[in-house]
Amino acid sequence: MSKVEERSLVKLNVEADVATIILNRPKVRNALNRQLMIDLIDIAQSVSDHEDIRSVVFASEGKDFSVGADLKEVSGMDPSGSLLRARRDAELGRKLLTTIKNIHQPTICAVKGVATGGGACIAAACDFRIASQTARIGLGEVKVGMNLMWNAVPLFVELLGLSRAKRLIMSGDLLGAETLEQWGLLDEVCSDTELETLAAQWARQYADLPPIAVQMIKRSVNQYALALSEAVMHMDEDQWILAARSDDFKECVGAFVEKRTPKPTGF
């Protein structure tokens, strides 16, 4: 089977039994706006439901995997608006990560350039992560006055352990691929020119295994590792509603859009 499906913001390429889902906003470094996330959820669910697909790769057009949420879109949101609307906006990211985590087939994320915020969260939601040696990954929400949402905290704690998860989430720093391979977030690092080939090798390795056994094992491991995730998932939205109404959030996002240094006050 060979199939190519292309929406304006997400592309799907299916070759034989391997599907590749490609983020396609290279002009804005694959920033995640609402429509891209909706398209990504739809395509990921469609791929998961396809019994002929044995493994799935997440990749990207352009130099970066994804710089996370489109802050220009976020800056246009009315923080004083409906609480229900604010919660629903926040729930979309959680739905995206849940959809990716629940894809039946093994998933491999191929990271190049920068993967920060929501981009890093998409990578964490996959089963395996490979990266080019110049890739950098981080969670910059704290630097714009936001909490880490999308029910991603349990993922990073499970992958990194408590101390390193705090360091990545609370610092907002971008860390290099070799460091994150040592930490356990990345499974393998390669040269920039070898990333696509390495992703295909990982996908083939898992596509060639008995699919029923592989998919049952994946589900069992995820259920065990993330058993408490559902219990705390609503904290993200509650914290977001508070953060989005703070003066610091308005100042930090405004500074990002205006390309100046923010001056947070703690209010």
What are these language model-derived features?
Residues M1-E61, T98:
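Conserved CoA-thioester-binding segment of acyl-CoA-metabolizing enzymes
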Residues M1-N24, D173-A207, Q215-A225, C252-F267:
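Amphipathic alpha-helical segments at domain termini/boundaries
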Residues R25-P26, H50, L209, S246, ...:
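Short loop-to-helix capping motifs
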Residues I43, L92-I103:
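Catalytic-core regions built around general acid/base machinery
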Residues S60-L96, A115, G145, A227-L228:
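Glycine- (often His-adjacent) and acidic-residue-rich active-site loop
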Residues T98-I212, S246, E251:
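Crotonase-fold acyl-CoA enzyme core
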